[in-house]
A protein has these predicted regions:
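Generic N-terminal initiation segments characterized by hydrophobic and/or small/turn-forming residues
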Residues: 7-10, 144, 189, 243, ...
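Acidic, gly/ser/pro-rich intrinsically disordered tails
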Residues: 202-275
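Compact mixed alphabeta submodule
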Residues: 112-234
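OB-fold ssDNA-binding interfaces and closely related basic DNA-contact patches used
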Residues: 1-143, 204-208
Length: 275
């Protein structure tokens, strides 16, 4: 056993842990039930747009997987779902819909009353995202991220007993008063210069790693096909397409369909698969 290699690995893991947690403090934040106030600060990594959209897969691997599409790379699951839809088979179309990546949005926020903890990443879905975009498009609200003349965002969050679902629901509204991020120049500078980057926070899997997770999900060791996580999400690509055609019952298992679509010996059907 190489003790030097073990020490190097330990140091690497500790460094990664410190980077992700920020000295033991989570870099992520989410609103709790009740009323809170935050300030969305200018995005250090994209000066013109404060929000970062990312694609994730839930329930396919042992952990949530960030899609390679987030880094502009080919995604085997996305290619697979395209082939499923193109087949015109109802079962395939349904499977493709369940396999689709879910969109999550991240915003850099300074939580009022917790400014000393620095900027956090707030993750939310389509409804809150649209509310923020609508506010930005409202001339009476304007740029609420402006350093000196922006607006705090007031949040009201209700729990499952109100929503009737297992999830909380948060509504947003702008403060009527314009204000700076902070009267403390150190807080302002730290908020602008020290921000976690969503793209760097999540593990970047290779094409082959994602493909292996998909194959394991479709053909687990026990012989039974896996189940997709029931992660709540709202699709970002509009209404689902229903104009597929049915050509009889297809008894091919999901695993066999996966093999067929990744088979180098199949006839050329004009698809865009890179393998």
């Amino acid at each position: 056993m190489d003790l030097n290699q073990i020490k190097q690995k330990l140091e690497s893991l500790q460094t990664q842990s410190n980077t992700n947690k920020g000295n033991g403090k989570s870099i992520f934040w989410k609103p709790s039930v009740g009323k809170q106030q935050v300030r969305i600060v200018p995005n250090k990594y994209n000066k013109s747009f404060p929000f970062t959209e990312m694609q994730f897969y839930y329930g396919i691997g042992q952990r949530v997987m960030a899609s390679p599409m987030n880094w502009g790379e080919k995604d085997p699951i996305q290619e697979f779902t395209k082939q499923l839809r193109d087949s015109g088979d109802k079962e395939n179309w349904y499977l493709a819909k369940k396999l689709d990546a879910k969109t999550r949005i991240f915003a850099p926020v300074l939580v009022r009353g917790e400014e000393e903890e620095g900027v956090k990443l707030w993750q939310f879905g389509k409804e809150v995202y649209q509310a923020f975009l609508n506010l930005a498009a409202d001339a009476e609200v304007g740029d609420y991220t402006d350093v000196s003349g922006g607006r705090d965002i007031k949040l009201t969050t209700v729990g499952p007993e109100v929503t009737g679902t297992p999830y909380n629901k948060t509504t947003v509204s702008p403060s009527m008063k314009q204000s700076p991020i902070s009267d403390n120049t150190n807080v302002v500078e730290r908020s602008l210069d020290t921000q976690p980057n969503p793209i760097e926070v999540f593990k970047r899997l290779t094409f082959d790693e994602v493909k292996a997770n998909l194959e394991t999900f479709l053909k687990p060791e026990g012989g039974e096909e896996g189940e997709i996580s029931s992660e709540k999400s709202v699709p970002f690509d509009g209404d689902s397409k229903n104009n597929y055609s049915l050509e009889g019952k297809d008894t091919t298992s999901k695993g066999d369909k996966f093999d067929n679509l990744f088979d180098d010996k199949k006839s050329n059907s004009g698809d865009d698969l890179p393998f």
